[in-house]
A protein has these predicted regions:
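Serine-hydrolase catalytic core recognition
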Residues: 1-190
Length: 190
């Protein structure tokens, strides 16, 4: 807030199932509703300018960021670090999704930001460790998503951090990540 904008950094937004529905059957709808409720609550307190709110996340949080930006106009920019953007590349389940791709193909498709790259209208910073060995978030996830977004004319930047895995450890990498995030926020949110 001291810089003139707000960032929802890795917010917790629960997605639940009701009755016979699995939680991910209505993932996008619940995710957007949760984000809107959070922004509404902070706005009601008088703390924010709704046009100057960004969202950021790491891993599953990055996946949520990409979905929020593709399916809402709530945010001025997004930061997605080491995420999974094409759920068909994790066909035997992920996080709370226990069904395989072949049991719930529409869920995998609907939850994959890659499949909705044409809807991205918000500036997005993708950051990924070149040596990410997390089976769901190999660097391929970010490079392919970046190529799709760029090919469709989206405002996107990809930063690959040398010799970094899923979490970043080198001081240089952390400082560079912070600088990249600051540049995005200064240019598109402030």
């Amino acid at each position: 807030l001291t810089q003139g904008y707000a960032v929802f950094d890795d917010p917790s937004m629960p997605v639940v199932g009701e009755g016979e529905e699995e939680p991910n059957d209505t993932f996008r709808k619940q995710l957007v509703a949760n984000a809107k409720a959070a922004i509404d609550a902070v706005d009601e307190l008088g703390y924010i300018d709704r046009s100057k709110v960004a969202v950021g996340g790491h891993s599953y949080g990055a996946f949520m960021v990409a979905n929020l930006l593709s399916h809402s106009d709530l945010f001025a920019a997004g930061i997605a670090r080491s995420g999974a953007y094409n759920r068909t590349l994790t066909p035997f389940g992920f996080q709370s999704e226990e069904r395989s791709y072949w049991e719930a193909p529409e869920v995998y498709y609907n939850m994959s930001p890659f499949m909705h790259a044409d809807k991205m209208k918000t500036p997005l910073l993708l950051i990924h460790g070149e040596a990410d060995n997390n089976s769901g978030t190999y660097p391929l996830q970010s490079t392919r998503y970046f190529n799709a977004l760029k090919g469709l004319g989206a405002n996107v930047r990809l930063v690959m951090l040398p010799r970094e895995s899923h979490g970043y450890a080198a001081k240089e990498s952390i400082l560079h990540m912070l600088w990249e995030q600051d540049q995005l926020l200064e240019n598109y949110v402030k």
